[in-house]
UniProtKB/Swiss-Prot annotation:
SUPFAM superfamilies: CheY-like, Methylesterase CheB, C-terminal domain. It comes from the Bacteria. It is found in: Cytoplasm. Coiled coil: none annotated. The lineage of its organism: Bacteria, Pseudomonadati, Thermodesulfobacteriota, Desulfuromonadia, Geobacterales. Its main location: cytoplasm. PROSITE patterns: CHEB, RESPONSE_REGULATORY. This is Protein-glutamate methylesterase/protein-glutamine glutaminase 1. GO terms for biological process: chemotaxis. It catalyses: [protein]-L-glutamate 5-O-methyl ester + H2O = L-glutamyl-[protein] + methanol + H(+); L-glutaminyl-[protein] + H2O = L-glutamyl-[protein] + NH4(+). Belongs to the CheB family. It comes from Geobacter metallireducens (strain ATCC 53774 / DSM 7210 / GS-15). One of its GO terms (molecular function) is protein-glutamine glutaminase activity.
Length: 363
């Protein structure tokens, strides 16, 4: 019995992008473009008429903003959406907002030589469309989350950090598709005195700083884009810069950030496998590994290495994942100690830390 191809509707105000995406998608045997629309108002009618499986949506468009349309779509007719974004600071902020509103993932448009650049992205585009077609679509919460800069006692008196012994705990996290929202949910629950956290989220370099700044505005801990050589402090999370590997390193008794321009691993740079291996090598049983929603198997091998080195490891459960790919692979390879729903993970994490003799944390 033949499988029906994935039906894709392209929504983009650029005729060139619509044409290029159509050629890329129609070159695949398992998907087809059933329609195109130059703006959301036309798209609204074509969704009703064509009933597509997946939508590609430009962020910035005339007549109706892409985000306004996405918010209405997710409220009235939730469906998988793949955002198509430019590599600019403004677009990165808007794209992250789109992920908050329920988009499954995004791809970026090249800045120059669009025709050749889009062809180079062809595999990424088609892979992400396949994943989006199977992804769990989540309606965003109706309550708007206001973003206010947090104030702490640091505004009056800076915190003094002691020198840590080699038993200092460290948390390393890997995520991909659906990970921006999973990470936000997890990090918002982190207490201000949590162990240091290193994060590899598959994301282009124009987006990671904006992503870290967004998280920092929401969390009790401090969140920033990682810088080579900086000391890793409790109550801080460090996000891998796009196109650079993030590794855990040591300087005496302290953990520090190491960034590498080494080749892609598991097709990714930054790679979760690279981060997890560095944690296995340099922290061993003092590390906790967490693998979250994402397609593919990046992190599965590294998580097994962490567990074999004595680290404790968590995987996000299938029900709470947008895409149960990376966690599924890590579980299958025997690298996972505990599988947990995303909402339960902070409590279970700190319950385990306290069972190992660490002080109590207020989660």
């Amino acid at each position: 019995m033949s499988t029906q191809p994935i039906k894709v509707l392209i929504v983009d105000d650029s005729a060139l992008i619509r044409s290029l995406l159509t050629d890329i998608i129609n070159s695949q045997t398992d998907m087809e473009v059933v329609g195109v629309a130059p703006d959301p108002l036309v798209a609204r009618e074509k969704i009703k008429a064509l009933n597509p499986d997946v939508l590609t949506l430009d962020v910035e468009m005339p007549r109706m903003d892409g985000l306004v349309f996405l918010e209405k779509l997710m409220r009235l007719r939730p469906m998988p959406v793949l955002m198509v974004s430019s590599l600019t600071e403004k677009s990165s902020f808007l794209t992250l907002r789109a992920l908050e509103l329920g988009a499954v993932d995004f791809v970026t448009k090249p800045k120059i030589d669009i025709s050749r650049g889009m062809q180079e992205y062809a595999r990424e585009i088609t892979d992400k469309l396949r994943v989006a077609a199977k992804a769990r679509v989540r309606q965003p919460p109706h309550v708007h989350l206001s973003v206010e800069r947090k104030n702490t006692a640091d505004a009056v008196l800076p915190m003094e950090h002691r020198t840590f012994s080699s038993t200092e705990k460290i948390i390393v996290i890997g995520a991909s598709t659906g990970g921006t929202e999973a990470l936000k949910s997890f990090l918002v629950a982190m207490p201000a005195d949590s162990p240091g956290i290193l994060i590899t989220q598959h994301m282009p370099e124009a987006f990671t700083r904006t992503f870290a700044q967004r998280l920092n505005s929401l969390c009790r801990i401090s969140v920033k884009e990682a810088e080579h050589g900086e000391r890793i402090l409790p109550g801080h999370a460090y996000v891998a810069p796009g196109n650079r590997h993030l590794l855990l390193a040591r300087s005496g008794a302290n953990y520090v950030v190491e960034l590498s321009d080494g080749p892609p691993v598991s097709r990714h740079r930054p790679s979760v496998d690279v981060l997890f291996r560095s944690a296995a090598n340099r922290a061993g049983r003092n590390a906790v590994g967490i693998i979250m929603t994402g397609m593919g198997d990046d992190g599965a091998a590294g998580m097994l290495e962490m567990r074999e080195a004595g680290a404790y490891t968590f995987a996000q459960d299938e029900k709470s994942c947008v895409v149960f790919g990376m966690p599924k692979e890590a579980i299958a390879r025997g690298g996972v100690d505990e599988v947990a729903p995303l909402g339960e993970m902070p409590r279970r994490l700190f319950g385990w830390l306290e069972s190992q003799g660490n002080r109590a944390f207020r989660v």
